Amino acid sequence: MARPDLTARLHAQRALRDAQGRRRPRRTVTRRDGVRLEVDGQWLTGFCSNDYLGLAQQFSVVNALQDAAAREGAGAGASHLVCGHHALHEALEREVAEWLGYPRALLFGSGFAANLAVQQALLSEENDVCVQDKLNHASLLDATRLAGARLRRYPHLDAEGAMRQLKHAPDGAAMLATDGVFSMDGDIAPLRALSLVARLQQALFYVDDAHGVGVVGDGRGAVAAAGLGVDDVPLQLVTLGKALGGSGALVLGRDDLIEHLAETARPYIYTTAVPPAMAAAALEAVRLARRDNWRRSKLTDLIALFRSEARRHGLDLMASDTPIQPLLCGDDHTAVAMSTALEQAGWLVGAIRPPTVPEGKARLRVTLSALHTPEQVRGLVEAIASARERVALAVREAAPPPLPVFA
């Protein structure tokens, strides 16, 4: 029997994505100035970045990177366990661990690599299970599959559902994993309830707070805002590529867990360390995030303004008090049409479609930054309301005439 033709398969899959409105072409950014971006030759006001505190272009952060690169070079030159672990890596790990109240931290090149490392190193035996929120980030879900562990999912934010799933998997070691702030909905996991579930079911509780640290509560993220610490959440992921404006991630945890990851996690062992200059930039960003409460205060005010203006215009908001503000569109084509109409008016907002979100839940994902102004927020909401009307009119005009009604 002939093998399937991979080229024919990918062409068929691409044609299907075209028909569904799910193509994802890359956009080329040539220049940035705060929240203004030149994209494919057009200047747009962006509301789709994860640079929540506006630190990616902060002068002192950029200066820290440049100074460290001039001293230490462009790269680490080796993995952490050979000769790539630099004093700047060590300083960053200690600073973040101290900030969030954990004994130790371990630096990774990305959040995806960190999530894979945690599950590959800890869920290593037959019958091990990872119970997860149905809407967890793809990196958490994929990590379970790639680690070879069993994956069980519970309904979104449902701590009782998590308990049921753990009870149905009594054999093998167990991990309960959740996002802290959910990247597509912007809501926050019920961490206190989930922590109790993990304790009762003898499961290791792991929180990926990529979108919470720097923003939620006093800046220490969703775990601290829930009044929890290392005794409740033995492992926590912090990313450097969201509120902290850089790239990379850290896993924070108990001494024994972090030591085990450093010695056995393949994504940590078999990759070159993050450039020391990037660690220097992240270190400065962490210090600013800890010190400059005005950034969070301004961001909180902008979130409240956006939601107030959106309600005034009758937009379909979701329950989020974080910088992630999704506006449901329903079908994929409407989301793309809305995003395109906004771009034509000078605004850059991403259309998020399956498989990133569930079927029928396509949306505009608006993300706010401390760099935005109230005028920009009001202008965006007005543009969204106008785009909604234009797209709805186009849909009505394209619809076939109604069938005649016979008595």
UniProtKB/Swiss-Prot annotation:
Q: What function does this protein fulfil?
A: Catalyzes the decarboxylative condensation of pimeloyl-[acyl-carrier protein] and L-alanine to produce 8-amino-7-oxononanoate (AON), [acyl-carrier protein], and carbon dioxide.
Per the UniProt entry, the Enzyme Commission number(s) are 2.3.1.47
Q: Which GO terms describe its molecular function?
A: 8-amino-7-oxononanoate synthase activity; pyridoxal phosphate binding
Please give the subunit comment from the record.
Homodimer.
Q: To which species is this protein native?
A: Stenotrophomonas maltophilia (strain K279a)
Residue positions annotated to bind substrate are R24, H137, T356
**Name of the protein described by the UniProt record:** 8-amino-7-oxononanoate synthase
The cross-references to HAMAP family, in alphabetical order and at most eight, read:
BioF_aminotrans_2
Obligatory cofactor(s)? pyridoxal 5'-phosphate
Q: Which family does it belong to?
A: Belongs to the class-II pyridoxal-phosphate-dependent aminotransferase family. BioF subfamily.
Chain residues that bind pyridoxal 5'-phosphate: G111, F112, S183, H211, T239
Q: Where is the signal peptide?
A: none
A GO biological process held by the record: biotin biosynthetic process
In this chain, where does the modification N6-(pyridoxal phosphate)lysine occur? K242
Pathways per UniProt: Cofactor biosynthesis; biotin biosynthesis
